[in-house]
């Protein structure tokens, strides 16, 4: 069965925005929103064709950030604040890719949640 392709409305956005980067051990997700929190563009490593263990590499993080940033740049976004969350590989590569795509990074904040000795962590891997 053929899928119906929907045409997205191209809405111009304000030049200020917020980039949320979630870098887990298994994947990287980048969401770009306006200041109010409405999503302008998003991307993930899986959406960009990476599968399995390749999703948590710095290169996958770079490609994911470039894809989301290019779409936001085309809609008129220029300056962004970056909120980064999670322990995954490629956190720095994602920020550098945002700058390479033409977005000016105004501030970077690490909002990784840290427990005050809450849940017991999973046991250590023995490889």
From Swiss-Prot:
One CC-aspect GO term: ribonucleoprotein complex
InterPro entries: Ribosomal_uS11, Ribosomal_uS11_bac-type, Ribosomal_uS11_CS, Ribosomal_uS11_sf
Gene name of the record: rpsK
Similarity comment: Belongs to the universal ribosomal protein uS11 family.
GO molecular function: rRNA binding; structural constituent of ribosome
Alphabetical keyword list: Ribonucleoprotein, Ribosomal protein, RNA-binding, rRNA-binding
Database matches in PROSITE patterns: RIBOSOMAL_S11
Gene3D superfamilies from the UniProt entry: Ribosomal protein S11
Subunit structure: Part of the 30S ribosomal subunit. Interacts with proteins S7 and S18. Binds to IF-3.
Positions of transmembrane segments: none
GO biological process, alphabetically ordered: translation
Protein name: Small ribosomal subunit protein uS11
Keyword RNA-binding: yes
Keyword Transcription in annotation: no
Purpose: Located on the platform of the 30S subunit, it bridges several disparate RNA helices of the 16S rRNA. Forms part of the Shine-Dalgarno cleft in the 70S ribosome.
Domain of life: Bacteria
A Pfam family per the record: Ribosomal_S11
């Amino acid at each position: 069965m053929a899928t119906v392709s929907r045409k997205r409305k191209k809405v111009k956005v304000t030049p200020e925005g917020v980039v949320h980067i979630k870098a887990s051990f298994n994947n990287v997700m980048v969401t770009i929103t306006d200041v109010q929190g409405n999503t302008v563009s998003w991307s993930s490593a899986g959406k960009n064709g990476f599968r399995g263990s390749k999703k948590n590499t710095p290169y996958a993080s770079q490609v994911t950030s470039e894809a989301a940033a290019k779409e936001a740049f085309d809609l008129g976004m220029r300056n962004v604040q970056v909120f980064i969350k999670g322990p995954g590989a490629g956190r720095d590569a994602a920020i550098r890719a945002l700058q390479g795509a033409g977005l000016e990074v105004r501030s970077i904040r690490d909002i990784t949640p840290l427990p005050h000795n809450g849940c017991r962590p999973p046991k250590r891997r023995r490889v």
